[in-house]
């Protein structure tokens, strides 16, 4: 019973409800009087869950006591602004005050921690899918007789897919009747099943198509994961939690090549996808039982739906349902699907950070082209040793998160305490740490032949900058556009994934054309480094002009 109470909006419990095995509610209705002031009195009952006996003998004789056993909770909305609106609406379903345990913000710490861990795990598994392929690329090229650029399509199209997916999926998660959970579970289930197709692909064209589709399907976890964390974590701690989530987002694609290399050495490239399939199955099992719906609008929608079902009265509604019902479906779809692009084009803040993050993300995936040149071509590392060379990024994640903690405690927390915190406070982190990215690119390029440890050290600096710029920008965007955070992240995901998909395609050609015998990756890395220096001015500009830009935004009202 305790499990059903704490995880009632999980996929497993949803199935139990659909099959009428359990009936779920919060508090029951004692008396409903729609005359006069439309008053409603409610009482509580010790049990919140009731199992159906399967018998329907007394189903035709429901009384008030029967309704009491259905455990419904109805909260009354009251507008005190005008005398005419003082009457209560018994059909408006809301949270039962700010301390309502049904509200995601008020869930227990243990429950929130479990959701955070599962969100990180889901993100890790999906991000692994991008780079776990790279150790097997040469084998795939040889088996299907394709060149390097064509072989790289399996990486690029996967990354492009999870940039395109959020344009459709992220707005859907903002619809109260859908929410986050169905989008997560349906897409991840299909993603898991298609790994079997990748492992058994008979030709290269089929593999490329499946990789693109799986990239699209994995996108909800990557783009909406931050919104899920924002559903349950207050703004005071959101930056820290997003930092933890981002560790998984960075660590997964850099650890995946080591796992992929192990599979290639032990078996062959097809076992890369079998390994990913098994990881997905384990994750899917955990999410089925312990990952609940987190969107507050959808939690209320589910509450209202249960009341409608148990009372047989379809007049119960939520404010969000009423808003969505009044908007024509065609217009609603246009707005939700068009909004990420609209905000990217019309909002200078969104556009600026989309460009900055896209370049950083593209530079990150450029390392997957540079590593074989440096560690394979210069130092003759084996396939597994090349996978180990990515550990510099993991070390960088640890130091980067420490910097984030220090900033949050020493700067952000103090400004929260004395009420001087503004969205621009988060930009201080990006302003102070942005120099690490160009330094890392220059260091990686010009010290590649000095000693193998120096390029690995440059990975640490790259993550120090990239990680904290991501945290600063995502926190800033989330605070500036709280109502449309999923759409903002969807547009950002499209921008950065487009860059990340393109960089591996021209990466090797760029290094070959710009490189010299003594400096094979120097000028190529430096070219990207110069662009990162130019975009480093963005947080400085927004720190000064951000408030005025936000005041003019129609999405910030």
Swiss-Prot record:
Which GO biological process entries does UniProt record here? xenobiotic detoxification by transmembrane export across the plasma membrane
Organism, as annotated: Candida glabrata (strain ATCC 2001 / BCRC 20586 / JCM 3761 / NBRC 0622 / NRRL Y-65 / CBS 138)
PANTHER family per record: FLUCONAZOLE RESISTANCE PROTEIN 1 (PTHR23502:SF23), MAJOR FACILITATOR SUPERFAMILY (PTHR23502)
Its ancestry begins with: Eukaryota, Fungi, Dikarya, Ascomycota, Saccharomycotina
General function of this protein:
Multidrug transporter that confers resistance to 5-flucytosine (5-FC) and clotrimazole. Also confers resistance to benomyl, but not 4-nitroquinoline-N-oxide, cycloheximide, or fluconazole. Plays direct roles in extrusion of 5-flucytosine and clotrimazole.
Gene3D superfamilies referenced in this protein's UniProt entry, alphabetically: MFS general substrate transporter like domains
Q: Positions of the region Disordered?
A: 44-67
Q: Does the keyword Transmembrane apply?
A: yes
* SUPFAM superfamilies reported for this sequence: MFS general substrate transporter
Q: Which family does it belong to?
A: Belongs to the major facilitator superfamily.
Q: How is this protein named in the record? A: Multidrug transporter FLR1
Q: Which gene encodes it?
A: FLR1
Q: How does it sit in the membrane?
A: Multi-pass membrane protein
The record's section on CDD domains has: MFS_Tpo1_MDR_like (cd17323)
| Xref: InterPro entries | MFS (IPR011701), MFS_dom (IPR020846), MFS_trans_sf (IPR036259), Multidrug-R (IPR004734)
The Low complexity compositionally biased stretches are 44-57
The listed locations are: Cell membrane
């Amino acid at each position: 019973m305790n499990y059903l109470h704490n995880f009632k909006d999980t996929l497993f419990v949803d199935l139990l409800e659909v099959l009428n095995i359990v009936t779920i509610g919060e508090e029951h209705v004692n008396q409903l009087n729609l005359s006069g002031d439309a008053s409603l009195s409610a009482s509580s009952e010790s049990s919140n869950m009731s199992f159906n006996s399967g018998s329907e003998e007394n189903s035709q004789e429901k009384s008030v006591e029967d309704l009491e056993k259905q455990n419904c909770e109805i909260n009354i909305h009251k507008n005190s602004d005008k005398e005419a609106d003082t009457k209560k609406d018994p059909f408006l379903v809301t949270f039962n005050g700010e301390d309502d345990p049904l509200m995601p913000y008020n869930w227990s710490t243990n429950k929130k921690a479990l959701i955070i861990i599962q969100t990180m795990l889901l993100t890790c598994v999906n991000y692994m899918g991008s780079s776990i392929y790279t150790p097997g690329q040469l084998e795939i090229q040889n088996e299907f007789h394709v060149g390097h650029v064509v072989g790289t399509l399996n990486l690029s199209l996967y990354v492009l897919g999870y940039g395109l997916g959020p344009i459709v999926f992220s707005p859907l998660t903002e619809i109260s009747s859908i929410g986050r959970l169905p989008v997560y579970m349906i897409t991840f289930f299909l993603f898991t099943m298609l790994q079997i197709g990748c492992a058994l692909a008979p030709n290269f064209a089929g593999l490329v198509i499946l990789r693109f589709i799986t990239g699209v399907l994995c996108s909800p976890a990557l783009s909406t994961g931050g919104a899920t964390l924002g559903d349950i974590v207050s703004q005071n701690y959101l930056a820290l939690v997003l930092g933890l989530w981002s560790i998984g987002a960075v660590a997964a694609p850099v650890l995946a090549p080591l796992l992929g290399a192990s599979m290639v050495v032990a078996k062959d490239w097809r076992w890369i996808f079998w390994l990913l399939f098994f990881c997905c199955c384990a994750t899917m099992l955990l999410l089925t039982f312990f990952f609940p719906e987190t969107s507050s609008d959808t939690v209320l929608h589910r509450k209202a739906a249960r009341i409608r079902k148990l009372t047989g009265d379809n007049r119960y509604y939520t404010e969000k349902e009423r808003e969505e019902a009044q908007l024509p479906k065609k217009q609603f779809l246009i707005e939700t699907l068009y909004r990420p692009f609209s905000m990217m084009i019309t909002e200078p803040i969104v556009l600026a950070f989309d460009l900055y993050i896209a370049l950083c993300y593209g530079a990150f995936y450029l390392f997957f082209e540079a590593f074989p040149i440096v560690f394979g071509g210069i130092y003759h590392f084996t396939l597994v040793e090349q996978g180990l060379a990515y550990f510099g990024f993991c070390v960088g994640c640890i130091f980067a998160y420490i910097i984030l903690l220090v900033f949050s405690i020493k700067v952000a927390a103090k400004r929260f305490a004395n009420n001087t915190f503004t969205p621009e406070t988060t930009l201080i982190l990006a302003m102070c740490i942005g120099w690490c990215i160009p330094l890392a690119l220059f260091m990686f390029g010009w010290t590649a032949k000095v000693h193998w440890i120096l390029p690995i050290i440059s990975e640490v600096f790259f993550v120090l900058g990239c990680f904290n710029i991501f945290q600063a920008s995502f926190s800033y965007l989330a605070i500036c556009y709280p109502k449309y955070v999923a759409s903002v992240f969807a547009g950002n995901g499209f921008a950065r994934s487009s860059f990340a998909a393109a960089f591996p395609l021209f990466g090797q050609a760029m290094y070959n054309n710009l490189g010299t015998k003594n400096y094979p990756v120097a000028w190529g890395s430096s070219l990207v480094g110069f662009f990162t220096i130019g975009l480093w001015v963005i947080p400085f500009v927004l720190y000064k002009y951000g408030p005025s830009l936000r005041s003019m935004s129609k999405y910030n009202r």
